[in-house]
From Swiss-Prot:
Location of this chain's protein in the cell: Plastid, Chloroplast
Superkingdom assignment: Eukaryota
Organism, as annotated: Nicotiana sylvestris
UniProt protein name: Small ribosomal subunit protein uS4c
Keyword Cell inner membrane: no
Amino acid sequence: MSRYRGPRFKKIRRLGALPGLTNKKPRNGSDLRNQSRSGKKSQYRIRLEEKQKLRFHYGLTERQLLKYVRIARKAKGSTGQVLLQLLEMRLDNILFRLGMASTIPAARQLVNHRHILVNGRIVDIPSYRCKPRDIITAKDEQKSRALIQISLDSSPHEELPNHLTLHPFQYKGLVNQIIDSKWVGLKINELLVVEYYSRQT
């Protein structure tokens, strides 16, 4: 299954706010109207929608998300918590959380077009897993810095999660530590996602 490239508002109307996909928000009451039209949701549909929320927010294909679930299952600790940590520490998501890109798809473009350095080297893989003490910077070119400046100027200036530090005038971000679960950038019940996949495999 490919990455979603369709109308974004249609998705947030059904699934709720997906800040990684778009900074638009569903109108108040639209979710309630959808629920009343569709009646009571089955447990399967509830798990499916939670999985879709995760997939669309982080901009993943079905195959990519399944791969992350399998990695999380093999790791120590809660599978759901590990899954969220893996997704939050992706380079495209870190750029988004720093405000250096307005959405995760925009961050992915920055990385694919070689505008981003990690520890002084160009990284063109959006799924690159960032680690504590990584230094993320814009390439020292006017175009790269201009693209990031647009995002920094238009970002909502929300409180940065405590695992990140931003130096906006240097176009630089620091990864201080692995993300704490309370700073995850999406309202999600990750256990429902794990349950969805445990019933599929």
